[in-house]
Amino acid sequence: MDAHFVGEVDVRWLVESGEDRKMQLLSDFAFVDSNNVRWEAKKNDVIDGASIPEVIWSQIVGTPFIGDYRRASVVHDVACDKRMHTSKDAHRMFYEAMLADGTPQPRALLFYTAVRLFGPQWEKTVGPTSIKFKSTLLSSSPIAVLDFNRLEQALDEVLGVDNK
């Protein structure tokens, strides 16, 4: 089965001091990856959109709540908060969810690289163990230069991640 989203993102803004970016989900939402793993974002979970520094908001990168990566950012936010899988798995799911939602691969690779390098990192999980993703979906591209698996290996080396 192809990777897909389940449900619609329905949120309420939470009023707070400061950036005022947090939202509460009003209904369940999920992403089912190519391995049929269901990444849940439950009703009442709190999200804050894509963590894009304001200094690089533009037509190319986008803002936290506008862009073809919004739904992927919802399940990624929750995956990072709940830590049911390793950070590497959560970030790979984010990449796959962006592709499933129509994000062009160059942008999805840019966001994946940014989140692997500068996003949250953890190894131990609170729930299921690390999962293996189908490399065919993650590396398929009409542009041969954009090879996800090679990028991931390079990021693993930079981050000192042991590939088991």
Whereabouts are the PLM-identified features?
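Extended terminal accessory/targeting regions
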Residues: M1-K164
